[in-house]
Amino acid sequence: MITLSHINHSYETEEGKLEVFNDLNALIEDDEFIFLTGKSGSGKTTLLKMLLNEITPDSGDIIVDGVNLRSLARRKKPYYRRSIGVLFQDFRLIPDVSVYDNLYAAILATGGSARDAEKKITYVLSMLGIDHLHKRHPQEISGGEKQKVCLARAVINHPKILLVDEPTGNLDPASSAEIMRLLDIIHRQKITIIMATHDQSVIENTDRRIIDLDNMNPEVCKHE
């Protein structure tokens, strides 16, 4: 379970202080799939970075499975980070190696075992229907395929939480729909998914819960 309790945060800009969150409160249950919505600058990416423990709010607490991130011991931070997968809008793949080697590198970078790498890679590529791409290099595949590989990398170690930041922003409608279908498959693996998006085609066709960050004290609500 994730609890956002009285989160306040602001940034200093040339024009002065920009308030991002003012007493933000929300509760996210285990295994939920929710959307973060709001206009540009509303704090969607900032909140994801807070959940990654990359940004500490000015005040308030973020509690994940009973652990307050504000007081997370330094030695435990790498273990916490390994429990989270991240999928961004842009394709952050190693360009000069194969899809397989991109996933292999991700396993080793997060402290995974080389001994189990082949089994993990085979499983996730098959689950996402992209096993035929394993020998291809990023420059040899389409944008939609690159995003699928990035998704495979994000879940290669079966994280407890998957943070997704505008994953359909650079994709055509068909590729966007395919990414959403694959996220549903991943969600069925008992992974909590928190997805930031301003894609109206996604928002308007969902019955999932939404946190609207345009409301400075949002309640988690259901799309009507």
Description of each model-found segment:
Residues 60-68:
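Conserved ABC transporter NBD signature motif
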Residues 97-105:
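Short coil-to-helix segment of the ABC ATPase nucleotide-binding domain corresponding to the Q-loop/switch region
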Residues 156-160:
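A short, proline-enriched helix->beta-strand linker immediately N-terminal to the Walker B motif
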